[in-house]
Structures are given as C-alpha cells and as structure tokens.
C-alpha cells in the first residue's frame, strides 16, 4: 500500500471493537420526541421574545429618562394629596443646598453644569481664536487672577473715588476738597453717565412703550441697597439684614481709611453710616410698592423736560435742582444735547413728589455718603480678600450662604454676562446640537396653533378682542438657540467689542471699562431706532424670555437640553418640558402686563372695555389662589398674588397649551412606548416631567428675600397652583373631587 493511501485514525488503535447496536425501546423514543418538542418550543419562545414588542421603550435614552424621573420622585406619596412631594420627594432627600447657594433646584443644577462648560472653553488657549474670543478669555483670566487682585488691596478703588466726588466718611477733608463745588446734578449724573449707577434718581434711555421703534429718556425710582423696601422696617425677620448692612458700610469705610493711613474714629464711622441708613430708609418709604406698579398704562407719563421741571421741582443744599442741567450732564458724555422741549417719560411721579422733602433734610455730605456707598458696595467683590470678607455677614443675612461662590464660577458668569455673544459662540461650538432648532420650531408652531384654537373656548372674551389676540399670537417672532451671526460673521462679533481692551493683571479696571462701555452704548441709543432683530438674551443661558416691546419669544441654546428637551427623549417629556416653557412665553404676551401691548410691541389698548373687565375678573381668581399659599421657609408669609400674577398666568396657560398640543401629537402619531420601571402612562409622565423641572428648595434667608423680590412663585407652588387648576391633570391621576390637587374651584385665564 503506497504512502499516499495510508490512513490517519482519530481514535486510539487499541480501542475495543463496538458491540452490535440494539434497537431503541418505546420509552427512549417517547423521551427523545419530548426533548425534541421542548427544544423546538424553547427556540420558538426565544425567537418570539427577541422580536416581541411589550410596549416598553428599551433605548438608552428611555432608560436614562426613566432613571432620572424615578430618582427624583417619591412614589410612596399620594399624587393627589401633594404632587410636589410625589414628583420631587426623592430629589429633596438626595440634594443638600451647597454652602455657596441661596437655593438649589434642577434649574440651578443645569446652570451649574453650563458654568462647567463655560469654564472649560474660557480657560482653553487656542491660537486660532478670533479677537472677540481672545478678549473674553483675557477678561476671564483677569477675574480668576486672585494673586494679582489680592496684591493690590483697595488701591484700584482709591484711585477711582475722586472721579465720583469721593466718599466723605473715608476721607478727612471732603468738605474742603469737594463740598464747596458739589452739586446734586453733577454728582448724581456722574455715577449714572460713567458707570450706569442710578442712585436717588433712576435716569435711563429705553424703548418708548407707545412707539416701540424709538428710544426715549425715562425717569424712575431707584433700586435700593437692600433687596426691597420691606427690609427697611428693620424689625423681626429684617432686623439682622439691616444690622449687617450698616456693619458692611462701616467695615469698608474702615478698610479704606486704614489703606490711606487715616485715623479711625469708630463713633464717627457709626454715626455717618447710620445716617446713610436713615436716608435710605426715607428713600425706600418714598418708593411705590411693586403691586402698585404693574399697570404699564398708569406707569407711562409722557411730558416735556420743561414740564418735568414744573411738576417735580426739587431743592438740594438750598438750591433748586435743574432737571435740564442734570439731563445734559449725562447726555453730553455721548455728545447729545437735550432741549427743554425734549419729551421724556416719568414712571414714578409719586416718588419724585415724595423725594422733595427728603432731599431738603440732608446735607451734601450725607447725600454723597449714600451715593458713593451704593457704587462702592457693588465693587467690593472685585477687590482683595479682606474687602470681600467684609461682605460675609451681609451676604449671609440676605442669602443664607456661608461661603463665597467658587471664583471660577463667578468669573464664568461675569464674562458671560458682559460678553454674551463671544461666550455664546464658544458655548454653541462646544455643546449645542444644532438639529434641535428645527424640532423646537415645529413645537412653537404647534403650541401657537393651540393657543389660537383655545381662544374659541373663552366665554369671557368677545369676538372683536379674540381677533386682535389671534393677530398678536401670529405676529410673535421666535428666536431659537443663538443668533447665526455669532458663528458666521466674525467681523461683526469682533466689532461689537472693538473698544474693549483688557489687561490680565487689572481686573478692577476691566470691570470699570465694561461699566463705561455698556452705559455709553445705552445712552447713544437715544437717537437710534430700536433694533427689533436684536436678541434679548445670550445663547449660554438656561432660561427663556418674552419681550413685550418686540413681541418676541427667545429660547437660548442653554435651555434646549434635558429635562426640558431632547430629540431622543419621549415626546411626553418634551411637551411637558420645553413645550410648557413655549406656552408659558407665548402666554406672557397676554398676561396682566403683556396684554397691554399690541402685535407690533406698542403700548396700545386693543381690548374692548367688557373683555378688559372680564380679564381682570378671571385674573382675580389666581391672585386669590396664589395669595392664599403660605410659605413656611419664609416664616409663614403668604405669597403676593399680585406681584406673581403675570408668571402664574403664564404657567397656567403654558401647561394647558402644551398638554393639548401633546394630545394632538398622539392623535396624529399614536401612543408612545412606555418608560421602563415606571407604572405611569404618558399623560402622567407629561405632568411629572413638568413638575420635576421645579424640584428645589431655598435657604430661609433667601425665601424671605425672594417672596418680596421675585415675580415667580416658588417652585413648589408653581407645581401645586398650576396643577390644581388643571382638569386634565386630575383626570390623568384619577384625583377625586375636592382632594388637595383637585379643588372644585379652578382658575383659568387662557
């Protein structure tokens, strides 16, 4: 046998020979058939399960959404008893307010995350950066350069003081140096024209409410050193803030005197700063309460400058105050001359009337002490550590915070606030998914359509006013994401900041440069037309806006992210998130303020008398409802139903419109797959996602502050108030009648 025919065995050649095979028994045959059948069934089941649709979404985005919702909620709470605790109970257990924060919420977490992105893009050196971006990065570096800031102490401020007529309490010869030539017109104007600081009289150039294509000079009451006029009672919950405020003044005055090697007389410092407090108390009491300033028709008082002089004569230091000289002191800085025939708008006639007897009681020294202080207190945080620390007790009394915000966070926000388009460019390039713009455009179209359709449901509004409301809704312009120019037009962006030149080791001077630049730009607008295409917000902002003068809604790139929006998350969440926000902003065009402006943004009464009266009646229901909420964190104070009315109307309108738009979506596209791990349908998920946007809590000090200053209701009451008025919510969660979340009386405006 040739080699090629040899065989390789796969078994050992010594293996025993097999016996002759026996036939299978009936039992073996039966068992084999059974095994075969079971195998076929198992394979079939596996195949079926692999392709079986159980109606649950198993994508990674659905799993992420479900995990977030489950983590935030407390399913042990009955949703019809307290939907805030049901939706946010888990969030409240897991989250503690950071020592640097006055409040903490899902909104604040998104802002924190945005700040991290800003930090990353602002500190990254790139040789290919355009000039505008280079300037933003230099400004950021100057702000975080703490060694340079600390080494300079208070010297940058000391150099500036002569330009604002000094600070009497911090110098030994003020009466001789400035007192003899001091005039109220020059001193008040200098702070305003150069630095945009409005003390005693709030002079500003803004859009003419009744002719929104033009700018006009306005006179208004000023902001105060404490958060609201209520604080100046200085008793009870406000006592600590008043004490800390005066101590803050004294501490800074002491530091400035020390830096100049001037003697320190504690009694004199205390005497002068308490006099400042006394003066500011009188000014606070002269201001009109916010709830009496919410009708733009009543606020608008147009007259000539000559008429202003006749109607509101003031006397300071025994001399008549010249409104013409004061106005020209400011406007001459931008080479604009104002004649007595110039028309101006007075927003605060009552305040200007009450100001007269106050000014006659105080000396130039007292007035200058207040004015300089109000400017200095804004600048303390840009000086060395010892100046920053002088503010600690004051910050604690107002905000409850025991630590300063991290320097990089404060600096990222500062640069974003002052160079919003340059920073917006960096943010968009780093973090914004451009395709979401088209999805949001479609959502706006849907919700606008729902708003118009629901006008037919309103029995309190007549046909004539409904037609005008529809015209206004159709005319609302939308801005989504960011202005194209910040990416595509480098020259325009560079030119916007052409006059600004920052130095890395001169943060204080950079701040002053920004103040001057911003105020000069605003004053020059007096003889310019209003640019209605201009965005009213930067791109790197977690918020949304409505402008009554432009009839424009804005959704910056910063808010187009979960939980508000994602092209990959369930649409119930998108409609309950950004959908509600869209409805909210559209409704602002028709709230107690926005309803007074027409489709072109002009302050014009387009309502019939009957519809206007009915609107006020419908609104009164919400004033009463929200005004009845008492807030334990604010010492049991009741919310102000008048000051929060516009936001409450917008919340209620927004949730209703977004829900109806989602129902339309389901009719057209069918039901969505459910989310895993949640025994909730998509109607319920819509309301749950809406509520979880507002999960959060406040420090008691800041609750006391915000209940007087914030036009929004606190988050828990935004959830409860809105959903108590929603029959659709009660239906979705099967809430019995007269349960807490389903009261018999429901408020509805839109």
From Swiss-Prot:
It is found in: Cell membrane. Its cofactor is Zn(2+). A lipid is attached at residue 2 (N-myristoyl glycine). A peptide binds at residue 103. Disruption phenotype: Mice are overtly normal in appearance and size and do not show obvious abnormalities in motor performance or coordination. Nerve conduction studies reveal no significant differences between mutant and control animals. Zn(2+) binds at residues 584, 588, 647. The modification Phosphoserine is found at residues 4, 6. It holds the Pfam family Peptidase_M13_N. Myristoylation is a determinant of membrane targeting. Glycosylation at Asn-628 is necessary both for surface expression and neutral endopeptidase activity. Binds 1 zinc ion per subunit. Glycans are attached at residues 145, 211, 285, 311, 325, 628. PROSITE patterns: NEPRILYSIN, ZINC_PROTEASE. A motif (Stop-transfer sequence) lies at residues 16-23. It catalyses: Preferential cleavage of polypeptides between hydrophobic residues, particularly with Phe or Tyr at P1'; substance P + H2O = substance P(1-9) + L-Leu-L-Met-NH2; substance P + H2O = substance P(1-7) + L-Phe-Gly-L-Leu-L-Met-NH2; neurotensin + H2O = neurotensin(1-11) + L-isoleucyl-L-leucine. One of its GO terms (cellular component) is plasma membrane. One of its GO terms (biological process) is lung development. The chain crosses the membrane at residues 29-51. Keywords: Cell membrane, Disulfide bond, Glycoprotein, Hydrolase, Lipoprotein, Membrane, Metal-binding, Metalloprotease, Myristate, Phosphoprotein, Protease, Signal-anchor, Transmembrane, Transmembrane helix, Zinc. Its EC number is 3.4.24.11. Coiled coil: none annotated. Residues 52-750 are extracellular. Belongs to the peptidase M13 family. Thermolysin-like specificity, but is almost confined on acting on polypeptides of up to 30 amino acids. Biologically important in the destruction of opioid peptides such as Met- and Leu-enkephalins by cleavage of a Gly-Phe bond. Catalyzes cleavage of bradykinin, substance P and neurotensin peptides. Able to cleave angiotensin-1, angiotensin-2 and angiotensin 1-9. Involved in the degradation of the atrial natriuretic factor (ANF). Displays UV-inducible elastase activity toward skin preelastic and elastic fibers. PANTHER family: NEPRILYSIN, ZINC METALLOPROTEASE FAMILY M13 NEPRILYSIN-RELATED. This is Neprilysin. It comes from Mus musculus (Mouse).
């Amino acid at each position: 046998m040739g080699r090629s025919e040899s065989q390789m065995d796969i078994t050992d050649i010594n293996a025993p020979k097999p016996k002759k095979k026996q036939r299978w028994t009936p039992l073996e045959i039966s068992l084999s058939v059974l095994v075969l059948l079971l195998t076929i069934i198992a394979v079939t089941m596996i195949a079926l399960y692999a392709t079986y649709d159980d109606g649950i979404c198993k994508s990674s985005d659905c799993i992420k959404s479900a995990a977030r919702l489950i983590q935030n909620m407390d399913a042990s709470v009955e949703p019809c008893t307290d939907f805030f605790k049901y939706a946010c109970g888990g969030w409240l257990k897991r989250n503690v307010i950071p020592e640097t924060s006055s409040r903490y919420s899902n909104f604040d977490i998104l802002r924190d995350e945005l700040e991290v992105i800003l930090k990353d893009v602002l500190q990254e050196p790139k040789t290919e950066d355009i000039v505008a971006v280079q300037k933003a990065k230099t400004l950021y570096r100057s702000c975080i350069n703490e060694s340079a800031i600390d080494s300079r102490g208070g010297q940058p401020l000391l150099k500036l003081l002569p330009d604002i007529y000094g600070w009497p309490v911090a110098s030994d010869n003020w009466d001789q140096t400035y007192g003899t030539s001091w005039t109220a017109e020059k001193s008040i104007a200098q702070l305003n024209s150069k630095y945009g600081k409005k003390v005693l009289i709030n002079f500003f150039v803004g859009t003419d409410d009744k002719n929104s294509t033009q700018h006009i000079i306005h006179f208004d009451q000023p902001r105060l050193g404490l958060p609201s006029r209520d604080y100046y009672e200085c008793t009870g919950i406000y006592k600590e803030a008043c004490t800390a405020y005066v101590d803050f003044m004294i501490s800074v005055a002491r530091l400035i005197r020390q830096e100049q090697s001037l003697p320190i007389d504690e009694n004199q410092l205390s005497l002068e700063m308490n006099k400042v407090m006394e003066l500011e108390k009188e000014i606070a009491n002269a201001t009109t309460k916010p709830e009496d300033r919410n009708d733009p028709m009543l606020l608008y008082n147009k007259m000539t400058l000559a008429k202003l002089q006749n109607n509101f004569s003031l006397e300071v230091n025994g001399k008549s105050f010249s409104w013409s000289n004061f106005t020209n002191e400011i406007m001459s800085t931008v080479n604009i001359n104002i004649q007595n025939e110039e028309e101006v708008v007075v927003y605060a006639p009552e305040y200007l009337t009450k100001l007269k007897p106050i000014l006659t009681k105080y000396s130039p020294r007292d007035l200058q002490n207040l004015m300089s202080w109000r400017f200095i207190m804004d600048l303390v945080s840009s000086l060395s550590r010892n100046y920053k620390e002088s503010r600690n007790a004051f910050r604690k009394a107002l905000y409850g915070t025991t630590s300063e915000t991290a320097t990089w966070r404060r600096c990222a926000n500062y640069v974003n606030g002052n160079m919003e388009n340059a920073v917006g460019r960096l943010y968009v390039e780093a973090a914004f998914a451009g395709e979401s713009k088209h999805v949001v455009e479609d959502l706006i179209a849907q919700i606008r359509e729902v708003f118009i359709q629901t006008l037919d449901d309103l029995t309190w509004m007549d046909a004539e006013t409904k037609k005008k409301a529809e015209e206004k809704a159709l005319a609302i312009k939308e801005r989504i994401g960011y202005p194209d120019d910040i990416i595509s037009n480098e020259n325009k962006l560079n030119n916007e900041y052409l006059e600004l030149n920052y130095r890395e080791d001169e943060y204080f001077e950079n701040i002053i440069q920004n103040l001057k630049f911003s105020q000069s730009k605003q004053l020059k607008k007096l003889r310019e037309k209003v640019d209605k295409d201009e965005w009213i917000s930067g791109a790197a902002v977690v918020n949304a806006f409505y402008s009554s003068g432009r009839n424009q809604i804005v959704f910056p790139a910063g808010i187009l992210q979960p939980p508000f929006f994602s092209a990959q998350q369930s649409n119930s969440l998108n409609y309950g998130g950004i959908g509600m926000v869209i409805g909210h902003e559209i409704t602002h065009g028709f709230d107690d303020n926005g309803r007074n402006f027409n489709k072109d943004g002009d302050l014009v009464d387009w309502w019939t008398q009957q519809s206007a009266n009915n609107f006020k009646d419908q609104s009164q229901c919400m004033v009463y409802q929200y005004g009845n909420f008492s807030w334990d964190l604010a010492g049991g104070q009741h919310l102000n139903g008048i000051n929060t009315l516009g936001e409450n109307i917008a919340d209620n309108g927004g949730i209703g419109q977004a829900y109806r738009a989602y129902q339309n979506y389901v009719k057209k596209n069918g039901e969505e797959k459910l989310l895993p791990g949640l025994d909730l349908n998509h109607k319920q998920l819509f309301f749950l996602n809406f509520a979880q946007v507002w999960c959060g809590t406040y420090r008691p000090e800041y609750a006391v502050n915000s209940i007087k200053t914030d036009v929004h209701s606190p988050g828990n009451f935004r959830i409860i108030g809105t959903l108590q008025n929603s029959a659709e919510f009660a239906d979705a969660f099967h809430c019995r009648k007269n349960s807490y979340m389903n009261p018999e009386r429901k408020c509805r405006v839109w």
